[in-house]
């Protein structure tokens, strides 16, 4: 199983838990509350990025969010930063490795999301490819 570096304060842990819950529940309103106004989103290896809460939310609403229950998130850490591994439900109802979210936490919420669209990274975190 993956490891997670516990944040030093409960507020940061709550922020991470709420981020994961927003994706798992396809809850755009909840995610809106968590993102700083100047949040940045990158999705390597795709050469696309977004800056600003509205732009990030429009993108996620159009292409990333699915139905509640179709995503499962597992907290982990990467390079000393909080991260979450994202699993997505396939047509066969199996949850498969999808991407790894590296999160930069700011003073008022999530300041940056770098989402690596590479399921092969899961093994580096000790995570299975399916759940």
Tell me what each language-model feature is.
Residues 57-131:
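Low-complexity, glycine/alanine/valine/leucine- and proline-rich hydrophobic stretches
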Residues 1-66, 70-72:
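Solvent-exposed, charged amphipathic helical/linker segments at domain boundaries
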């Amino acid at each position: 199983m993956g490891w997670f570096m516990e944040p030093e304060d409960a507020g940061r842990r709550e922020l991470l838990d709420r981020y994961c819950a927003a994706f798992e529940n396809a809850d755009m309103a909840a995610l809106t509350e968590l993102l700083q106004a100047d949040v940045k989103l990158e999705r390597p290896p795709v050469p696309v990025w977004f800056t600003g809460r509205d732009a990030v939310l429009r993108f996620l609403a159009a292409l990333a969010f699915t139905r509640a229950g179709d995503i499962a998130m597992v907290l982990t850490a990467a390079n000393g930063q909080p991260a979450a591994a994202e699993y997505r439900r396939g047509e066969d109802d199996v949850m498969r490795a999808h991407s790894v979210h590296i999160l930069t936490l700011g003073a008022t919420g999530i300041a940056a999301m770098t989402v690596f669209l590479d399921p092969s990274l899961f093994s580096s975190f000790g995570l299975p490819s399916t759940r």
